[in-house]
Curated annotation (Swiss-Prot):
Reaction(s) catalysed (UniProt annotation): (2R)-2-phosphoglycerate = phosphoenolpyruvate + H2O
Annotated Gene Ontology cellular component terms: cell surface; extracellular region; phosphopyruvate hydratase complex
Residues binding Mg(2+): 242, 283, 310
UniProt keyword annotations, A-Z: Cytoplasm, Glycolysis, Lyase, Magnesium, Metal-binding, Secreted
Cofactor list: Mg(2+)
Disulfide bond positions: none
Record-stated family: Belongs to the enolase family.
SMART domains in alphabetical order: Enolase_C, Enolase_N
Enzyme's top EC category: lyase
Protein name: Enolase
Organism the protein comes from: Streptomyces avermitilis (strain ATCC 31267 / DSM 46492 / JCM 5070 / NBRC 14893 / NCIMB 12804 / NRRL 8165 / MA-4680)
UniProt: (2R)-2-phosphoglycerate binding residues: 163, 335, 364-365, 386
EC numbers for this chain: 4.2.1.11
């Protein structure tokens, strides 16, 4: 098979105007692969280290020239001559070169950029689309798009503590139909907000970020938009949350809706929401190191709703193994840049699926036009993808790639729909 001939990197801008790393890998047969690395706003404390320059005179300290140089001067020369299809060997060579537990020497942004670009180059050399190259002949499941249409928390400046309110078109027959439903609800929500005199400004991920009095007010607005768009809440379109609770956890308590709450009180609050709204999924309902609290909420609500670990697991197989062992959460959020390599991402997904955990592929709030995660979602048949509102090119690029994949798969394409959420029983 073709071997790695050249590795180059550059500093580009992400969707928030911050620098990030883009890598191109060239093989000796002329095949090339390119990948750009995303970056998060609410980052888990246990994520792999993203290398930033810290020079206040360039990009306010957020430059990534160090990571770019790490690719050009250290990683590239090390990988020349490697068989591009040996993904695990290549990733391991980079881990060995970095020689830290958290990729803090070369930077997870440098390592991931190379890791993904190698996969793209190898798929081109194999004359296969990336989803087929990584997933083999069984990759055929199109994910439910979990569209973040209302923003609060650290993605917006408002009184809403919950970071993301998502819609999940579970009743659609195909991915393309699901995307249409989502876009129609999104536009209807804009009209609803305008009618009520609320702001239609957008958050980082394309969702609206009005200043609302409560989290329930946000859910009520979305239910209203679903109905006005002509769909049935819970039957055709369900709801999902990303609470990002670590963002409002202070001194052992959750500062939520103007009150200081314990994990038990937060769990009671979620129980009320689950009984009142057609929720299929709650992500990061508690602090990222509150393992005992996570077990309690999973025991109480895990048979009714998907409890997703994002900051809890940070796509790390070791932390995920602990969650499986202790019964904390029942689903994994998959973010390639949290762990910093394709191999470890695939290992985490495999571990989750082997143990009955669902997986949701995810973007970051700082994205680019890179569409790798769309292919990855289909490659691992995870059945769910979270990549923002059906607006802004950095988000829509992923949805459009999934439309193309659905077209390539043709009759073999299967839309996950309701089957992605087996714990969700019925509409409210």
């Amino acid at each position: 098979m073709p071997s790695i001939d050249v590795v180059v990197a550059r500093e580009i801008l992400d969707s928030r105007g911050n620098p990030t790393v883009e890598v191109e890998v060239g093989l000796d047969d002329g095949s090339t692969g390119r990948a750009a690395v995303p970056s998060g706003a609410s980052t888990g404390a246990f994520e792999a280290i993203e290398l930033r320059d810290g020079d206040p005179n360039r990009y306010q300290g957020k430059g990534v020239e160090k990571a770019v140089l790490a690719v050009i001067e250290q990683i590239g020369p090390e990988l020349v001559g490697y068989d591009a299809t040996e993904q695990r060997l290549i990733d391991q060579a980079m881990f060995d070169l970095d020689a830290t537990d958290n990729k803090g020497s070369l930077g997870a942004n440098a390592i991931l950029g190379v890791s993904l670009a190698v996969a793209h180059a190898a798929s081109e050399a194999s004359d296969l689309p990336l989803f087929r190259y990584l997933g083999g002949p069984n990759a055929h499941l199109l994910p439910v798009p979990m569209m973040n249409i209302l923003n609060g928390g650290s993605h917006a400046d408002s009184n809403v503590d919950i970071q993301e309110f998502m819609i999940a078109p579970i009743g659609a027959e195909s991915f393309s139909e699901a995307l249409r439903w989502g876009a129609e609800v999104y536009h209807t929500l804009k009209k609803v907000l305008k009618t009520k005199g609320l702001s239609t400004g957008l958050g980082d991920e394309g969702g609206f970020a009005p200043n609302l009095e409560s989290n329930r007010a946000a859910l009520d607005l979305i239910i209203e938009a679903i109905k006005q768009a002509g769909y049935i809440p819970g039957e055709q379109i369900a709801l999902a949350l990303d609470v990002a609770a670590s963002e409002f956890y202070k001194d052992g308590k959750y500062e939520f809706e103007g009150k200081s709450r314990s994990a038990a009180e937060m769990t009671e609050y979620y129980e009320e929401l689950v009984s009142a709204y057609p929720l299929v999924s709650i992500e990061d309902p508690l602090y990222e190191d509150d393992w005992a609290g996570w077990k309690v909420i999973t025991d109480k609500l895990g048979d009714k709703v998907q409890i997703v670990g994002d900051d809890l697991f940070v796509t790390n197989p070791e932390r995920l193994a602990r969650g499986i062992e202790e019964g904390s959460a029942n689903a994994l959020l998959v973010k390639v840049n949290q762990i910093g390599s394709l191999t470890e991402t695939l290992d985490a997904v495999e571990l989750a699926q082997r143990n009955g955990f669902k997986c949701m592929m995810s973007h970051r709030s700082g994205e680019t036009e890179d569409v790798t995660i769309a292919d990855l979602a289909v490659a691992v048949n995870c059945g769910q993808i979270k990549t923002g509102a059906p607006a802004r090119s950095d988000r829509v690029a992923k949805y459009n790639q999934l439309l193309r994949i659905e077209e390539i798969l043709d009759d073999a394409a299967e839309y996950a729909g309701r089957s992605a959420f087996p714990r969700f029983r019925s509409a409210n």
